[in-house]
Amino acid sequence: MVEERLQGVRFFEFLTEEEREEFAEGSELVTFEAGEVIIEEGGEPGSLFVLTSGRVEVSKSITGGRERLLAEIEATGERTVVGERGLLGESGASATVRAASRVEAIKIPRKTFRRMISEGRPAAFRLSYRIARTLAHRLTRLDEEVVEAIRELERRGETDLEAFRDKLMTDWAV
């Protein structure tokens, strides 16, 4: 069942059927109800979630304990995974991911991924490469957005760091 669901996910199209089966063995189907937190900002590095249905919201805490919505992700969209950093990194989650509707997902635990890496499984290394490319693309986009935010603030004659920070958090998209 998990392997069949992975087969239809664009993010995993580079895997062979056998490699998808390897991931499916250590994965599980999970469901989150609307409002339920899937990943909590600052939380321990955790699992990769492959969204198969539903919609999630990605938000970040900003000044004064406020939360800023960064993105909404539909399971049917091009980006159908959340939690990529949790597989590769050691730092806490950079944002909160919350179910905006009922969400069904495939959970690939960090433990499963790390075991596959330690066993030298090519599928895990291929997934690492795919995640690295995705993160590099996002970093490039973020750099462009930061430069644009600075230019806009300079055009308006603003030099206040707080104004820049708020502008960055408002316009930053995951």
What is each of the regions a protein language model found here?
Residues 103-108:
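A short hydrophobic beta-strand segment most commonly corresponding to one strand
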Residues 20, 93-94, 111-153:
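A small-molecule sensor/coupling module
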Residues 1-29, 33-34, 172-173:
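Cyclic nucleotide-binding regulatory module and flanking cytosolic helices
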Residues 7, 24-25, 74, 98, ...:
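Alpha-helix boundary recognition
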Residues 25, 29, 87-90, 118:
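Short, intrinsically disordered, mixed-charge
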Residues 37-101:
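Cyclic nucleotide-binding regulatory domains
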Residues 145-174:
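Phosphate-/nucleic-acid-contacting segments
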